[in-house]
């Protein structure tokens, strides 16, 4: 079993992981950093992010106060206001650094940054690169990181578990690209593993978003919070044969798109004064209720009234995808339905990204900073990632860590071949159980799904005594464990109380 040592270990190659590597290297160019990616370095949620980054830029019309208020309102009273203030006031500085790193953003006719509008925002403040902002960020940052002599990148590395001793995180174990069992010792370990959208049957997230960081945290008794708040994006294209849904950016609704029911009515105007530009939780719930009312599987996005040439210029990715699927947006309505999109809860961290285990940190979607509360405001996620990576870099480079890994029998991994199709059955069953109604539906639906997933977890553990001897097996276990914690938090209080009461009597 091979061992690797480094000062800083970063698990994940989205904006959080990449920008942390860059910030650390700017402060200390000689700092040894190891960056892990589960597959290719660009396969992550950031790569697929369409909308942009929320930044107060036009101070004649907008203000930090307005952005703060919009964020707090979207979060339904569960945001940490101190965190919200900090992230939003830091945004312009972090945006300037992205621009210095070569990220190109759209300009308006006057040569300034073009500011888009999205749901829940009271002002235009979304900076963007057409409808593929995340792609632009990833493709500009990756070459910068690859050129840094102090950063080693390992792709196709699957992390199975953290190594925790006496409350300290000493690194992790996993399998390298050849399937070789590996221990990585680190003075500081940073989880930037992204979200858990693949827990659900329909998601906008790529196949790598399997809750790995959260699941490793669960197994190491690292504190989590608000895992039940999974954000569903209201406008994913309805394609029943696909589990990874194509996202239709919220910016299109800011541009003027309408959402219609089967009668061609803009039903959202009856639900909220902002109609299509209400926050994502409001729009997704309204769509779900409308589909239930109609006994249908989708509603419709109307783009027919929008100026076609300008639309093609601003949203080329969406236009091309619609065309490939046979839709003429000047004549056809686009079928849409909500899809699991963002994990608002996660690993609890403080203002510098530290967890409740020493030398273990978390940033990005896998973390819970308090910024998003119960519902993330559109385009605040990339902002959170870069602000926290900057702050964590400052902390890590000003802190002296001393650590010694004490290898023992529990850290030994052995690679074992598995029956892929048998493991896949567990994953498929989970995704059939997990849908919007599983966490936001009627009480009995939530309880039923929790019972089904708990039973699935029991069967998995009975069949596979060891989950960590193959990446696909461990990843499937991560999905089921993450689903159970999401559902456990979603259970009605009365159900939890009754279960606790029965256990006490026993």
Feature annotation, model-predicted:
Residues 2-16:
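Beta1/beta-strand and adjacent pyrophosphate-binding region of the FAD-binding site
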Residues 3-6, 20-23, 29-32, 40-42, ...:
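Glycine- and aromatic-enriched mobile tails/lids
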Residues 9-11, 184-193:
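Short hydrophobic core segments
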Residues 39-72, 76:
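Conserved N-terminal glycine-rich FAD pyrophosphate-binding loop of Rossmann-like flavoproteins
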Residues 79-92, 125-143, 154, 203-211, ...:
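Short beta-strand to alpha-helix junction loop
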Residues 100-180, 192, 236-239, 259:
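Conserved redox-cofactor binding core of oxidoreductases
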Residues 161-181, 327-369:
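FAD-site-proximal beta/loop scaffold in flavoenzymes
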Residues 216, 222-332, 385-386, 395-399:
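An anion/pyrophosphate-binding glycine-rich loop and adjacent beta-alpha core
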């Amino acid at each position: 079993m091979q061992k690797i040592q480094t000062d800083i270990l970063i698990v994940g190659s989205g904006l959080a992981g990449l920008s942390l590597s860059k910030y650390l290297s700017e402060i200390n160019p000689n700092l040894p950093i190891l960056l892990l990616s589960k597959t290719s370095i660009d396969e992550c949620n950031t790569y697929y992010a369409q909308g942009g980054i929320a930044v107060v830029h036009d101070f004649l019309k907008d203000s930090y106060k307005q952005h703060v208020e919009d964020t707090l309102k979207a979060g339904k009273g569960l945001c940490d206001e101190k965190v919200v203030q900090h992230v939003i006031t830091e945004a312009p500085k972090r945006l300037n650094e992205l621009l210095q790193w070569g990220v190109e953003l759209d300009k308006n006719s006057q040569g300034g940054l073009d500011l888009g509008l999205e749901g829940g925002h009271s002002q235009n403040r979304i900076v963007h690169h057409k409808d593929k902002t995340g792609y632009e960020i990833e493709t500009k940052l990756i070459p910068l990181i690859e050129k840094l002599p102090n950063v080693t990148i390992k792709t196709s590395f699957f992390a199975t578990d953290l190594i925790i001793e006496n409350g300290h995180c000493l690194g992790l174990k996993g399998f390298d690209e050849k399937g070789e069992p590996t221990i990585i010792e680190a003075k500081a370990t940073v989880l930037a593993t992204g979200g858990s959208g693949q827990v659900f049957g329909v998601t906008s997230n790529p196949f790598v978003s399997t809750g790995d960081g959260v699941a490793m945290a669960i197994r190491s008794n690292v504190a989590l919070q608000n895992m039940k708040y999974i954000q569903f994006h209201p406008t994913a294209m309805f394609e029943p044969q696909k589990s990874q849904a194509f996202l239709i950016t919220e910016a299109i609704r800011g541009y003027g798109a309408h959402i219609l029911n089967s009668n061609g009515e803009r039903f959202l105007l009856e639900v909220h004064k902002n109609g299509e530009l209400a926050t994502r939780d409001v729009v997704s719930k309204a769509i779900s209720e409308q589909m239930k009312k109609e006994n249908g599987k989708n509603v419709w996005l109307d783009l027919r009234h929008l100026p076609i040439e300008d639309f093609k210029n601003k949203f080329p990715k969406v236009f091309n995808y619609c065309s490939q699927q046979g839709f003429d947006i000047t004549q056809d309505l686009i079928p849409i339905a909500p899809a699991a999109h963002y994990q608002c809860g996660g690993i609890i961290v403080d203002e510098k990204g530290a967890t409740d285990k020493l030398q273990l940190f978390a940033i990005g979607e896998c973390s819970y900073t308090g910024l998003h509360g119960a519902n993330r405001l559109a385009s605040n996620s990339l902002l959170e990632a870069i602000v926290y990576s900057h702050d964590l870099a400052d902390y890590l480079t000003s802190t002296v860590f001393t650590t010694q890994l004490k290898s023992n029998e529990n850290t030994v991994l052995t690679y074992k071949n598995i029956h892929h199709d048998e493991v896949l059955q567990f994953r498929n069953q989970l995704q059939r159980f997990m849908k919007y109604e599983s966490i936001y539906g009627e009480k009995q639906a939530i309880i039923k799904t929790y019972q089904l997933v708990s039973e699935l977890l029991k069967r998995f553990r009975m069949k596979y005594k060891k989950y960590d001897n193959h990446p696909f097996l461990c990843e499937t276990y991560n999905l089921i464990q993450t689903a159970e914690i999401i559902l456990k938090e979603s259970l009605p209080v009365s159900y939890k109380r009754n279960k606790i009461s029965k256990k006490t009597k026993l």
